[in-house]
Amino acid sequence: MASSSSSIFTGVKFSPILAPFNSGDSRRSRYLKDSRNKVRFNPSSPRLTPHRVRVEAPSLIPYNGLWAAQPNSHKGRLKRNIVSGKEATGISLSQGRNFCLTCKRNQAGIRRALPSAFVDRTAFSLSRSSLTSSLRKHSQIVNATLGPDEPHAAGTAWPDGIVAERQDLDLLPPEIDSAELEAFLGCELPSHPKLHRGQLKNGLRYLILPNKVPPNRFEAHMEVHVGSIDEEEDEQGIAHMIEHVAFLGSKKREKLLGTGARSNAYTDFHHTVFHIHSPTHTKDSEDDLFPSVLDALNEIAFHPKFLSSRVEKERRAILSELQMMNTIEYRVDCQLLQHLHSENKLGRRFPIGLEEQIKKWDVDKIRKFHERWYFPANATLYIVGDIDNIPRIVHNIEAVFGKNGLDNESTPSSPSPGAFGAMANFLVPKLPAGLGGTFSNEKTNTADQSKMIKRERHAIRPPVEHNWSLPGTSVDLKPPQIFKHELLQNFAINMFCKIPVSKVQTFGDLRNVLMKRIFLSALHFRINTRYKSSNPPFTSVELDHSDSGREGCTVTTLTVTAEPQNWQNAVKVAVQEVRRLKEFGVTRGELTRYMDALLKDSEHLAAMIDNVSSVDNLDFIMESDALSHTVMDQTQGHETLVAVAGTVTLEEVNTVGAKVLEFISDFGRPTAPLPAAIVACVPTKVHVDGVGESDFNISPDEIIESVKSGLLAPIEAEPELEVPKELISQSQLKELTLQRNPCFVPIPGSGLTKLHDKETGITQLRLSNGIAVNYKKSTTESRAGVMRLIVGGGRAAETSDSKGAVVVGVRTLSEGGRVGDFSREQVELFCVNHLINCSLESTEEFIAMEFRFTLRDNGMQAAFQLLHMVLERSVWLEDAFDRARQLYLSYFRSIPKSLERATAHKLMIAMLNGDERFVEPTPKSLQSLNLESVKDAVMSHFVGDNMEVSIVGDFSEEEIERCILDYLGTVKASHDSAKPPGSEPILFRQPTAGLQFQQVFLKDTDERACAYIAGPAPNRWGFTVDGDDLFQSVSKLPVAHDGLLKSEEQLLEGGDRELQKKLRAHPLFFGVTMGLLAEIINSRLFTTVRDSLGLTYDVSFELNLFDRLNLGWYVISVTSTPGKVYKAVDACKSVLRGLHSNQIAPRELDRAKRTLLMRHEAELKSNAYWLNLLAHLQASSVPRKELSCIKELVSLYEAASIEDIYLAYNQLRVDEDSLYSCIGIAGAQAGEEITVLSEEEEPEDVFSGVVPVGRGSSMTTRPTT
């Protein structure tokens, strides 16, 4: 089970309002089950982002707590990055793949690890502000350039972290009278000083923001303000169809691909977005790429070619996408949106559309929709990136887009509707292909009109009317809705409240958001401190209060999940805690703690202003503009937060916060706001111990009764908690130092006690207790740091009589969250106050503990104290073990309800000979475990020589080495006899077993299909499962294609030949070449299986290359339809085996190199990436990992030849005996004979679409490429 990354991130989620934050990961995020644009927070760092509090009880550890455990995440197994030491986000084959319907996009806003106590990822100072000085500061803040009639949006997500509790927080200064305060709060917030806005004569609006991360690259996004919400009854899905046809039909976009540019597109309720990520200049000629990128976007949006052949290709692609998207998560999302927005089209206009309509449209129908909506005044262009000459960019925009639409429409003067309102949009004359202004002979339909109808964007987006959940609304309570399905595993209920968006444009607006943030941040602690039994009634309780630009409203949601048999108690507990918070409010201690945390975290965020990626900034601005919030940069966000913080009072916080919760706390009262909807999603059957599967029944009346009974339960005020200032006192530290005499000792093989490499800035040390330490000073993330402990062993060290012991043990440690004499709550608050986020993870080959911290207020020292206490005085609790075991029992039982997980699980069992260490532990294995066995399984790994700590951050040499000696050096040395556990042999199953091909059939109301194809590979360092060292035979390896290799060899002369020789002798040879090979195979799979044959919508090739285990494997994942999936599997096998007959072309290798090198360059500014590079640098079980693997990485990629790629390819076992495949089919007739399409029915081409995040984010179409 790959990285069993569990994410029980109990946290607060808010809509971003201040400024985006980027932690170095600007890749499009994976599937977010929660809908809406929300950002996870830790109350530890209450940040003004989506007001969401999430409390997940199994781990009873707040999101800010030190050990928030995350149940198995499906990441980290099949997709380990080939670059040394870096683990790419991936999925565990045993757990299946998260086929996110909407997730290829990043979330707008904050992207950062949240302060939290131990998150189990196994799978896987500002003094009080003076109001007057704040006013002076405000008047000096520079404002941005404003475009005509352009609403200013607000925005940055507030940091997640919480600072040391201060009881001396002096709130409203007495010298400020109410009139002055009112005047101050009415002042407008400052606009982003570098954000340039403008509008062309034809109405096209544009925004330009210089941003240096990543360097020499920029983002260009064309947002057309039309989406599924604008479709008529017979047009459902047509906006998405146009996205496909326009984007993939653009020749100018295709030409950009050779420059290193990446592009994609997606459709949502309220808009369609085409985006290009491009270098600023071409690599060789240094030609400016801005004009070419703008020209491509112009062709895509305003000059598409609606060729019949392209329309038919995309019709087939979308129909395939529709079936692939139809997971149970998508269906749940549909249910939530249908009931939340039952009064308008948001509840029934899902972007993917309706199958029966998609099949019917002709080219003319599609073109007419484009003509109606695709015009300059209905679009906004965003350009964010490494820009040094804004006037030149403006000139390029005018030159490329300026003539569009001028010949056939009046220029809109304002965004308000015309005389015909929204209907005017449907009366616009037909413009051929939407190319107004570029054609001459095709104006016959419009030339004789005396007056053109003005085309304008809607004044309100999305153009729908809502029934608001406001007190006094004369609407009857809608009965709870129940969605039952056999593929659901747990009970989940959502109570929704829907109100208008409150624009954040003044200091008073920001103050209200801050007060709500403080109030809602308390909820997770309320629940976590009260429910500590081994079988708590709920799995998670989550309160979300967030703005949604895509839905045009603010939604507050209480979500309760639980095991079905516990659902009534879970609902009672949740509403009881909400009522307690509403009735008694937050305490003085909570107010000071959360306020301090917000100020400290926003200060840290402001210091990171130069490290936010362009795509994060752009997404944030786009969402903020949709909500009409004022956009500020991080520095402005911090200054304004400081300004309003000093005016906040406890009474106002509780008054403002209570209003948010009234729809729950006052439920049933005549004056209470009515919930917009109550929706329960439940399984049809549940597992009952000793009985098996039995029917699960629930009624609307029972739900109402459970809510009311929870509200009637007696409640008491929240007690104050004592928060430790430190986990180890100075006197204790002195005593330990005297006892253990920590010091640095010579590093094995060097004779030196300190190795420092000037080129990389990496320093290596070894402590007298055996712990190896690597650190790198980095200023790219100001005053921030990250630390990781890696302990060799992991699940591979589990024995046949302790299956699951390591993974359950790590989860147990996370669930308990205690160290020394401190309670879990004290440890959590310690982490909150010091802005520490800690996570635990167990993979197949190691256990890891990671800490993110700031260097403010001794944050690094606090993180080291926590690590010391975990190593020296961790506490193992029986009830924590019970919760951990129950979690994995539930997780195992849910496998048959997931097509992807069930298919992947069966494949892994077949390929690895039933080895349970690579899949979820079975109920039988789990029942045989006890607290002592899991504790021993985990702690036996913690032997000095088996532990390596790496740290990257903005610290000084003196600071870091003092912490290393004080807190790591004083960890008790291992006994001489102590050795980390060995591992039982890992074997691939022999072909004689006849399990090379298998199938899984899943009964479902809807049809879907997926497949996995896998086989053996070496590990990253050239070792194989058979014990071979490939470096010993690299010179004897068979060559792939004599003709090719011979001609290429002739090109290698002198230095080139020496370079190739050096590459083949380098320890990272197979890591580098396998990475390039994966890129090439991925490209071929998409081109052949998806685009040419049209057999799939989504296909990928991934390599899992271990570092410590002598094996690896490759996996091809493909989704399809039951009628095509068998041919899709055959096509994937043909591509995989076809590299000899269809030899690799130089352009394929060049593109693979460019992709990986660009990714490497972009990631180098991230502390987390450097931490990955440092992994295993001193590990005795990874002897080939050395500094050259980091220093020479770029030159290794550049030196790789086609012959080298074939040397790597020949190590993949792709013959029929070694290759394993498993096909999963879901449908009403699953298990019966599936009709396979004939050759004539096979489509010629296919492609994929996109998805943003948010409630119903699975509605958004997938990326187009």
UniProtKB/Swiss-Prot annotation:
Protein EC: 3.4.24.-
Active site: 243 (proton acceptor), 314
Binding site for Zn(2+): 240, 244, 321
Note on cofactor: Binds 1 zinc ion per subunit.
InterPro entries assigned: Metalloenz_LuxS/M16, Pept_M16_N, Peptidase_M16, Peptidase_M16_C
GO annotation terms (biological process): embryo development ending in seed dormancy; proteolysis
Location (main, coarse): plastid
Compartments (UniProt record): Plastid, Chloroplast stroma
Domain of life the protein comes from: Eukaryota
Cofactor(s) the record lists: Zn(2+)
Entry GO CC: chloroplast; chloroplast stroma; mitochondrion; plastid
UniProt entry keywords in alphabetical sequence: Chloroplast, Hydrolase, Metal-binding, Metalloprotease, Plastid, Protease, Transit peptide, Zinc
Transit peptide: 1-143
Pfam families: Peptidase_M16, Peptidase_M16_C
GO molecular function terms listed in the Swiss-Prot or TrEMBL record: metal ion binding; metallopeptidase activity; mRNA binding
Disruption phenotype: Embryo lethality.
Cysteine pairings via disulfide bonds: none
Extra information: RNAi plants were almost all seedling lethals. Surviving plants exhibited slower shoot and root growth, and grossly aberrant leaf morphology. They also displayed defects in chloroplast protein import.
Function: Cleaves presequences (transit peptides) from chloroplastic protein precursors. Initially recognizes a precursor by binding to the C-terminus of its transit peptide and then removes the transit peptide in a single endoproteolytic step. In a next step, pursues the cleavage of transit peptide to a subfragment form.
Family: Belongs to the peptidase M16 family.
Protein name stated in the entry: Stromal processing peptidase, chloroplastic
Gene source species: Arabidopsis thaliana
Protein encoded by which gene: SPP
